[in-house]
Regions:
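A glycine-rich phosphate-binding loop feature that marks nucleotide/adenosyl-phosphate handling sites
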Residues: 92-96, 181-182, 197-199, 229-240, ...
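Long, contiguous, secondary-structure-rich segments that constitute the structural scaffold
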Residues: 439-492, 496-497, 589, 596-598, ...
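Long, well-ordered, tryptophan-enriched scaffold segments
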Residues: 51-188, 283-284, 441
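Glycine/threonine-rich phosphate-binding loop and adjacent beta-strand/alpha-helix elements that clamp
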Residues: 5, 397-429, 741, 762
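Short beta-alpha connecting loops at secondary-structure transitions
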Residues: 55-63, 378-380, 387, 403, ...
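Conserved short loop/turn motifs at secondary-structure junctions
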Residues: 163-170, 196-204, 235-237, 344-349
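Short gly/pro/ser/thr-enriched loop/turn and capping motifs at secondary-structure boundaries
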Residues: 50-54, 67-71, 78, 374-378, ...
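Extended redox/cofactor-interaction regions of prokaryotic respiratory oxidoreductases
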Residues: 1-34, 41-44, 70, 218-410, ...
Length: 803
């Protein structure tokens, strides 16, 4: 979230799209209801199903799964055509006025630079025109034909209300009503908050779904505002912490990037990741990248990391390609993987194409599962009839189960959707042989060191040089790790005026104190300030709220620097006055920025060219994404890889995302509409949490049996009655479940045909105390978003028959 949960109450419009907050986030949804009840907010829901969120909405609009970009691009067109934008915000705070290269183009579904053989783009044309000083050229009149504003207008001009209705199946009147209400928040004293979740991310255009919404917020002037923002409702407790700490194949903590094999030395790595300002006098905060990186290396390797050895740069692995789950399991399938560590995850139930996952795991020599509970992954080799019809005798994978603790059995912090780090304390000791994850990893670390010391080996420096200065080396404590994340002064630190800001050995209070000379250490720069010499800020529990905005700066701690709303400089106009005084976050008092949040802007006075989007080299919000996105600098509608239309009404020659993450062997497992005529989409229920709570008896009682949902019209066509057992199949396999026939799903008229949707809850499997069921991801396709590689769980093709 750029904002936070409580801030939702400040919105005038709450738009829930790509998520189902009332059911998947029932506690957090209270703030949407608070906005309705106490701020007279309008709640809008756009969803393929009429959900519990929709049941309390003021406006509900149905949509075909996988067509969100068409809907949102139609909103962009409406705002532009009807001049329903915050014009001053767009002019000064976005890149609308910057000029784009003359060789950038878009034609027939493809942007300039496409290489059909490699299925990727040369993005060099997706950039600005630069002057002799290296700064992007600008036309503040917005009349130049190559300015972002005019290119955007031309790009979205195709997304008329009729086109939206034809592709999305959303009735035109419903779409226009949504546009009208959203447009009302272009006024400076009104805001919209967008709430989304996996319903947007789990598509082959997932990242572009979110970007399109962010573009709407920029046009409306809602970024940086109380009651505004781009707000992801995280699907797991602490999944925000996972991304913060960089637990991805090409990432490092604090959203730093793991070096690639092309970056052969530290200099080339830092040059590739340290941007230069592209407009004069910008904060360009990523220019501090070397400070964050060197401090990370000092935390990783301690005294072993020195300037003379480039801070241990050579000890980091260098990636040759992205090892996402789609790629890695294909490597397993090809016999290129010997062993697999699975920590706190259940791939057999969570990854797409479950039958392929089981086949891949069967080719391993060994697998280690670290989890508090028995998972389908840990018992994938067992035969459970139709739901897991394997031959145990033919599977030679050796499975090691290491029981771990759950959150209630350990101290630590949880990072919520709003970036708040909240400390929690152990409720009870772990049962039996269970150990916490830190203790398990410490045991592996020490045993590996002992083996290398005894037997020798090559390439051992990353392990042997690692800093491991815990009081109990075999059982690191949560507070020690938290302090490492925060960071220390390794020498006395002085500011530019010679004033001492931290003594050697003291905890740091700000990432502004990090240095690139080896005098500071921090494992995660964005967490600096979370545990200072004044104590554990994550344990703060003062919920006083003098502003009434819900920022509660004394409750827990939010990164960065306890700031509750990112880019809050944008909440004030170019003169430093709040767009809406009633929702003032920060303002200029004549000498500094002050207010109801931690300012993100230093002391740059109003009237200077410094833009509010401090992480961007141009200081502006990007309506044109220059060279960042895989499939284009503007969003474009591409059909799901399994489309019920068999074409793309906008450009039949480019049906689906042209740079989608799809391997040849997986392409053979994609279905066609002739055999699988209905859209399948997966989702969660309030009564269960993924595949975890089927181990809990009360949850199993609340939702005891696997079911799927279909419309009354589809049920009539297929001769299915409510409560019948049905078989749902895709090109990859089948599941059996009870049919729930409901009016909450309806057919949509799309491109001259009726499109039906089959709703598939995800929570069942063959482990736990709940009734045994089939794994929903038996049906889903092994294809991913080109940016995040997230699989397409939300739009695929199925058939359904009475069992």
């Amino acid at each position: 979230m750029t904002n936070h949960w409580v801030d939702i109450k400040n919105a005038n419009v709450v738009m829930v799209m790509g998520g189902n907050a009332a059911e998947a986030h029932p506690v957090g949804f209270r703030w949407a209801m608070e906005a309705k009840n106490n701020n007279d907010a309008t709640l809008i829901v756009v969803d393929p199903r009429f959900t519990r969120t929709a049941s309390v909405a003021d406006i509900y609009a149905p949509i075909r799964s996988g067509t969100d970009i068409t809907f949102l691009s139609g909103v962009l067109r409406y705002l532009i055509e009807n001049n329903k934008i915050n014009a001053e915000y767009v002019k000064h705070y976005t890149n609308a006025s910057l000029l784009v290269r003359d060789d950038f183009a878009f034609e027939d579904g493809l942007f300039s630079g496409y290489d059909a053989e490699k299925r990727q783009y040369d993005k060099s044309s997706w950039n600005y025109q630069f002057d002799e000083n290296g700064y992007a050229k600008r036309d503040e009149t917005l009349t130049h034909p190559r300015c972002v504003w005019n290119l955007l207008k031309a790009h979205v001009s195709r997304y008329t209300p009729d086109v939206v209705e034809n592709i999305c199946g959303t009735p035109k009147a419903d779409f226009l009503k949504v546009c009208e209400v959203l447009a009302s928040t272009s006024a400076p004293d009104r805001t919209t908050t967008f709430l989304y979740a996996l319903g947007w991310t789990q598509h082959t255009v997932g990242a572009q779904n979110i970007r399109t919404m962010a573009m709407i917020q920029l046009l409306l002037g809602n970024m940086g505002m109380a009651g505004g923002g781009v707000n992801a409702l995280r699907g797991h407790s602490n999944i925000q912490g996972l991304t913060d700490l960089g637990l991805l194949s090409t990432s490092l903590p604090g959203y730093l990037t793991l070096p690639s094999e092309k970056q052969v030395d530290l200099q080339s790595y830092l040059e590739a990741n340290t941007p230069k300002a592209t407009r004069p006098d910008q904060v360009n905060y990523w220019s501090n990248y070397p400070k964050f990186f060197v401090s990370l290396m000092k935390s990783f390797y301690g005294d072993a990391a020195q300037k003379e050895n480039n801070w241990g740069y050579d000890w980091l692995p260098k990636w040759d390609q992205t090892y996402d789950v789609i790629k890695y399991f294909n490597m397993m399938d090809e016999g290129k993987v010997t062993g697999y560590f699975c920590q706190g995850f259940n791939p057999v139930a969570s990854f797409p194409d479950k039958n392929k996952v089981v086949s891949c795991l069967s080719k391993l020599k060994y697998m280690v599962v670290i989890d508090p509970l028995v998972t389908e992954t840990s018992t994938f080799w067992q035969n459970h009839g139709e739901s897991n019809d394997v031959d145990p005798a033919s599977i030679q994978t050796e499975v090691f189960r290491l029981p771990s603790t759950c959150f209630a059995e350990e101290d630590g912090s949880i990072a919520n959707s709003g970036r708040w780090l909240q400390w929690h304390w152990k409720g009870q000791d772990a049962p039996g042989e269970a150990r916490n994850d830190g203790e398990i990893l410490a045991g592996i670390y020490h045993h590996l060191r002992e083996l290398y010391q005894a037997e020798g080996g090559k390439g051992v420096e990353p392990l042997m040089k690692m800093s491991w200065n815990y009081k109990q080396p075999h059982e690191p404590q949560s507070d020690e790790v938290a302090k490492e994340n925060n960071g220390y002064a390794l020498e006395d630190l002085y500011d530019a005026n010679g004033v001492l800001i931290a003594k050697k050995g003291q905890l740091l209070s700000s990432f502004a104190h990090l240095r690139d000379d080896g005098t500071t250490a921090s494992s995660c720069w964005i967490y600096t300030g979370s545990w200072t010499e004044q104590g554990n800020q994550m344990a703060n529990r003062d919920n006083s709220d003098p502003s009434g905005l819900g920022n509660t700066l004394g409750w827990a701690w939010a990164w960065p620097l306890n700031r509750r709303v990112l880019y809050n400089r944008a909440s004030a106009d170019i003169n430093g006055k709040p767009w809406d005084p009633k929702r003032m976050l920060i303002q200029w008092n004549g000498s500094k920025w002050t207010g109801n949040d931690i300012p993100d802007f230093g002391n740059a006075a109003p009237g200077t060219p410094t833009g509010p989007f401090i992480m961007q080299p141009e200081g502006m919000g990007r309506l044109f994404a220059i060279n960042k996105m895989a499939e284009g600098p503007f969003p474009e509608h591409y059909e799901p890889i399994e489309t019920p239309l068999g074409t793309n009404p906008l450009h039949p020659n480019v049906v689906s995302n042209p740079v989608v993450r799809l391997y040849e062997q997986d392409a053979l497992r994609m279905g066609k509409k002739e055999q699988f005529p209905y859209v399948g989409t997966t989702y969660r229920l309030t009564e269960h949490f993924h595949t975890w709570t089927k181990h809990a008896l009360l949850n199993a009682i609340a939702q005891p049996e696997q079911f799927v949902e279909i419309s009354e019209t589809l049920a009539a066509v297929k001769g299915i009655n409510n409560g019948d057992r049905v078989t749902v199949s895709s090109k990859r396999g089948f599941i059996r479940a009870v049919a729930v026939v409901t009016r909450r799903l309806k057919p949509l008229n799309v491109n001259g045909q009726q499109v039906e949707t089959v709703g598939i809850p995800i929570h069942w499997g063959f482990e736990g105390v709940a009734r045994k069921g089939y794994i929903a991801n038996t049906l889903t396709p092994n294809v991913g978003d080109a940016n995040s590689q997230t699989p397409e769980y939300k739009a695929f093709l199925v058939n359904i028959e009475k069992a």
